[in-house]
Amino acid sequence: QSPYQIITNHPELDMSVRTLYSYLDKGILSARNIDLKRQVKFKPRKVHKTQIKDRSVFIRRMFSDFQALELDHFAEMDTVHSSQDSKRVILTFFLTREKLFLAFIMNRCTKGAVKLVFNKLEHQLGTYDFLTLFNTILTDRGSEFGDPESLENGINGIMRSSIYYCDPMRSGQKGGIEQAHTMLRMILPKKTSFEYLTQWDLRTIVDHINSTPRESLGGRTPYDVA
């Protein structure tokens, strides 16, 4: 747990987050700063993805185009890869208003697999609710996202979303989903095989992540806000 989560879940401590950090720095408490999620300085993430090669895909879908929209809320999208012994990946979404994290297992990291998830979600939610949640999506330049038109055009021919891309090597431009991945990797560390991971397993993990209080939500959880 982060210091913020500790203070939120244990009001009997009657101290601020700043005070808790101070106590940890001074060695008054047994935990060390190196044990804390936000104190650790992570190395830049290595990029293992195959990148989109067709540059025409990015016309009017650049990060600068996305910024010009000046949106209050949108969705972020990414994939999390298994260990090398499995081709399965997790397609993830982060809804920035609710801080809500969603995850779906895919058998392959392909454009077609991503489209199948989009179509399934639209079937389950209905076109109107899909449009409400995924009207604008910011993602990276992984090749699995290289056919934006197939993702933008819905099952009934109605435009269901608009896809935009981060600048190269700038994963921090979709920082919400990167933070959610940090929480996901606490449960599914790197080099974990997803070969036998089920959607039910993922639902349990996602429920845990979305039930964690957030400072940015005033101590509420994403489920409280959604």
Where do the PLM segments sit?
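Charged alpha-helix within mobile-element recombinases
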Residues: 142, 160-226
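A short, amphipathic alpha-helix used for macromolecular contacts
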Residues: 1-12, 62
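Active-site beta-loop-alpha junctions of metal-dependent nucleic acid enzymes
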Residues: 82-86, 103-128
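Short conserved beta-strand segments at catalytic cores or DNA/RNA-binding microdomains
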Residues: 67, 80-102, 107
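Acidic/histidine-rich, metal-coordinating catalytic segments
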Residues: 130-147, 167-169
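Mobile genetic element proteins and their domesticated derivatives, centered on retroelements
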Residues: 6, 20, 78, 99, ...
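Short, surface-exposed basic-aromatic patches at helix termini and helix-loop junctions that form
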Residues: 149-161
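Basic, flexible linker segments flanking DNA-binding modules
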Residues: 15-67
